[in-house]
Amino acid sequence: GRDAYIADSENCTYTCALNPYCNDLCTKNGAKSGYCQWAGRYGNACWCIDLPDKVPIRISGSCR
């Protein structure tokens, strides 16, 4: 797995305010854990730890 901003099918990050929301989202997708990264590269977005390779992550390019 990898540590990354989890993305939806449109290459958009998940906006967040609280850590539990991201931890839940990340672990449901197979990650070890997750938290809300505040004021990061994509604003407030969920960051996952050890996310499986099959799950999409935010890559360069626009969020559609």
Curated annotation (Swiss-Prot):
* Keywords associated with the record: Disulfide bond, Neurotoxin, Secreted, Toxin
Instruction: Tell me which GO cellular component terms the UniProt record holds.
Output: extracellular region
Keyword Membrane included in the entry's annotation: no
Keyword Acetylation present in the record's keywords: the answer is no
**SMART domains in alphabetical order:** Knot1 (SM00505)
UniProt xrefs under SUPFAM superfamilies: Scorpion toxin-like
Q: Which Pfam families match?
A: Toxin_3 (PF00537)
Molecular functions (GO terms): sodium channel inhibitor activity; toxin activity
**Example GO BP:** defense response
Compartments reported by the entry: Secreted
Which InterPro entries does UniProt cross-reference here? Answer: LCN-type_CS_alpha_beta_dom, Scorpion_toxin-like, Scorpion_toxin-like_sf, Scorpion_toxinL, Scorpion_toxinL/defensin
List each copy of the LCN-type CS-alpha/beta domain by range. 2-64
Question: How is expression of this protein distributed across tissues?
Answer: Expressed by the venom gland.
SS bond partners:
C12-C63, C16-C36, C22-C46, C26-C48
Instruction: Tell me which CDD domains the record gives.
Output: neurotoxins_LC_scorpion (cd23106)
Function of the molecule:
This protein markedly relaxes the rat carbachol-precontracted anococcygeus muscle. This relaxation is inhibited by the inhibitor of nitric oxide (NO) synthase, N-nitro-L-arginine methyl ester (L-NAME), suggesting that the response induced by this protein is NO-mediated.
**What does the similarity note say?**
Belongs to the long (4 C-C) scorpion toxin superfamily. Sodium channel inhibitor family. Alpha subfamily.
Q: How are the domains described in the entry?
A: Has the structural arrangement of an alpha-helix connected to antiparallel beta-sheets by disulfide bonds (CS-alpha/beta).
- Protein name, per record: Makatoxin-1
- Please give the organism: Olivierus martensii
